[in-house]
A protein has these predicted regions:
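Electrostatic cytochrome c docking/interface patches
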Residues: 23-42, 110-115
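Hydrophobic alpha-helical targeting segments used for export or membrane insertion
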Residues: 14-26
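Cys/His-enriched microdomains
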Residues: 45
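C-terminal capping alpha-helices of c-type cytochrome domains
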Residues: 93-115
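Bacterial N-terminal signal peptides that target proteins for export
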Residues: 2-16
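Residues within well-ordered alpha-helical secondary structure of globular protein domains
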Residues: 42, 82, 105-108
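Gly/Gly-Pro-rich "capping" loops immediately C-terminal to redox-active cysteine motifs
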Residues: 37-39, 48-84, 89-90
Length: 115
């Protein structure tokens, strides 16, 4: 049996608590997911124009098939903010909250992790 001095307990609890917090994520609420789906199909240009995503009924012909890519929400956010390849940036077109909604919708629809 290990002997633990009282001085180390607060630090151990703090580190353990931070470890637990780092592994948790905030689930998107259903209204945010629904808004993300709507934006995916209605933005100009619409994500659905280029990307295939079964959950959105999208059969794009240009960009990656998101159902196969299974990209997480952070990667979708980076692509929306900065653009990637021929995909334009949406930073000047939609709010950060709307970008988050699209990112979480795509991550959930593909089974990828969501922040």
């Amino acid at each position: 049996m290990a002997v633990v001095t009282w001085r180390w307990l607060p630090r151990a609890w703090a580190v353990g608590g931070l470890t637990l917090l780092a592994g948790t994520s905030v689930a998107a609420d259903p209204s945010e997911i629904a808004r993300g789906k709507l934006l995916f199909t209605t933005l100009q240009p619409a994500c659905a124009t280029c990307h295939t995503l079964q959950a959105a009924g999208a059969e794009g012909q240009i960009g990656p098939v998101l159902d196969e890519l299974k990209t997480d929400a952070d990667r979708v956010l980076r692509a929306l903010r900065n653009g990637i390849g021929v995909m334009p940036s949406y930073a000047e077109k939609i709010s950060p909250q709307d970008m988050q909604a699209v990112a979480r919708f795509v991550a959930q629809a593909t089974g990828a992790a969501s922040p």
